[in-house]
Curated annotation (Swiss-Prot):
The gene is msrA. InterPro entries: Met_Sox_Rdtase_MsrA_dom (IPR002569), Met_Sox_Rdtase_MsrA_sf (IPR036509). Keywords: Oxidoreductase. Belongs to the MsrA Met sulfoxide reductase family. Transmembrane segments: none annotated. NCBIfam families: msrA. This is Peptide methionine sulfoxide reductase MsrA. It is an enzyme of class 1 (oxidoreductase). It catalyses: L-methionyl-[protein] + [thioredoxin]-disulfide + H2O = L-methionyl-(S)-S-oxide-[protein] + [thioredoxin]-dithiol; [thioredoxin]-disulfide + L-methionine + H2O = L-methionine (S)-S-oxide + [thioredoxin]-dithiol. The active site is at C16. GO terms for biological process: cellular response to oxidative stress; protein modification process. The keyword Cell membrane does not apply.
Length: 162
């Protein structure tokens, strides 16, 4: 960790949080990752409630990082690379608004960076369809149940990626 550096948070939804957490956990400069829920109206949601699509929440990963060791722009690159941002309310076989592509920004600087990154990604020619990723202010982060935390790491790797 950088000397006298404050840690920052970034929050991303890109489908099943098991895979997304595993992608960010491996990035040098990321201090911690947590699987959880954000963006809905139900307080203290459970996994079953979120999967029922009645809470408005997305499965997300809260990333705590040292900005002296890894930039927010680099985390955005990981986000774009770990899912298909052109799929509306789904990733592969996982279907529903809880699997939506979303960037929850924690500051005006993060919002600007996320919007610029989306524009760049759209112009890159990497995607045949328009990007549907939402960019919205961060809301209350609700931790997912313990068995979801570091799910793939606890099982020796693997992937839930389609």
């Amino acid at each position: 960790m950088g000397e006298n550096t404050s840690l920052e948070k970034a929050t991303f939804g890109a489908g099943c949080f098991w895979h997304v957490e595993e992608e960010f956990r491996r990035v040098p400069g990321v201090v911690s990752t947590l699987a959880g829920y954000m963006g809905g109206w139900k307080e203290h949601p459970t996994y079953e409630e979120v999967c029922s699509k009645t809470t408005g929440h997305a499965e997300v990963v809260e990333v705590t990082f040292d900005p002296a060791a890894v930039t927010y722009d680099h985390l955005l690159r990981v986000f774009w690379d770990c899912h298909d941002p052109t799929q509306l309310n789904r990733q592969g076989p996982d279907i529903g608004t809880n699997y939506r592509s979303v960037i929850f920004y924690h500051s005006p600087d993060q919002e600007r960076a996320a919007r610029a990154s989306l524009e760049h990604e759209q112009r890159s020619g990497r995607h045949a369809r328009p990007i549907v990723t939402e960019i919205v202010p961060a809301a209350t982060f609700w931790w997912a149940e313990e068995y979801h935390q570091h799910y793939l790491e606890k099982r020796g790797g693997g992937s839930c990626r389609w």
